[in-house]
């Protein structure tokens, strides 16, 4: 139904554009500035056209869409945000893994290495690594050597399980298992320097405890315990 689609360049699977109608105008925003994107969206919207700003994954995670929404609000233009599947969720599916395993990690830290875009104080990799929680690291696959150093400096052991997920959910998706200490080696061996997520933590191992939710000794709002806790051990 869209009359105009502005999509986020190499980050969006081009196969999605095949669903556009024949007369739809399609623009690649990879070489565009924020102002150029807005200059394309506003006239089309004011003319009653259906405009789609197509981001990768879910726009709420490193999508740079707040600045676009603020401008549209100032111009009095209505819009809808359609939730997507973030690549960190797609990466878990590719890994066939669960980020929040009982007695392993009940928290997921989504972050990135500092590059040309700085990160605030106390939000650097080493600071977060000190928690020992599951970490999903965006926009950092070209800095795996430094990433490994910061993870270890923060408290992860070099042999902590890690995985690099390249182009999660794409047809050419690739999963590389490694450790915190071998991240750089694994990335180089597989020619991965962009379009990849890095996951770190014990959730990639084999040790965890059974959840209480489906434990027959556990009572919750929808079910009474059916056996004594001692008998379930």
Predicted features and spans:
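Structural recognition of alpha->loop->beta junctions
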Residues: 3, 72-78, 102, 183-192
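A contiguous loop/helix-start segment that scaffolds small-molecule binding in enzyme catalytic cores
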Residues: 36, 47-51, 107, 115-233
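Active-site donor-binding loop signature of nucleotide-sugar glycosyltransferases
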Residues: 29-31, 112-113, 167
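Hydrophobic packing residues within well-ordered alpha-helices of enzyme cores
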Residues: 16, 72, 91-92, 147, ...
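Active-site catalytic pocket residues across diverse enzymes, especially alpha/beta-hydrolases
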Residues: 20, 95, 151, 155
């Amino acid at each position: 139904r869209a009359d105009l689609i502005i999509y986020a360049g190499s980050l969006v699977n081009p196969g999605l554009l095949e669903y556009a109608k024949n007369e739809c105008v399609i623009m690649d925003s990879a070489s565009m500035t924020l102002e150029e994107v807005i200059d394309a969206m506003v006239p089309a919207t004011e003319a009653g056209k259906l405009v789609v700003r197509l981001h990768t994954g879910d726009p709420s995670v490193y999508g740079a869409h707040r600045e676009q929404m603020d401008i549209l609000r100032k111009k009095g233009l209505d819009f809808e945000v359609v939730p997507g599947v973030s690549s960190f969720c797609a990466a878990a599916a590719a890994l066939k893994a669960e980020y929040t395993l009982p007695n392993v990690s009940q928290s997921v830290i989504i972050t990135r290495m500092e590059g040309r875009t700085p990160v605030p104080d106390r939000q650097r990799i080493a600071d977060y690594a000190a928690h020992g929680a599951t970490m999903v690291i965006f926009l950092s696959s070209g800095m795996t050597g430094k990433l490994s150093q910061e993870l270890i400096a923060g408290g992860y052991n070099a042999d902590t399980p890690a995985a690099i997920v390249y182009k999660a959910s794409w047809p050419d998706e690739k999963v590389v298992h490694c450790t915190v200490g071998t991240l750089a080696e694994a990335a180089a061996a597989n020619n991965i320097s962009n379009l990849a997520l890095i996951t770190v933590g014990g959730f990639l191992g084999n040790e965890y405890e059974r959840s209480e939710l489906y434990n027959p000794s556990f009572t919750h709002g929808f079910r009474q315990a059916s056996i004594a806790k001692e008998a379930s051990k």
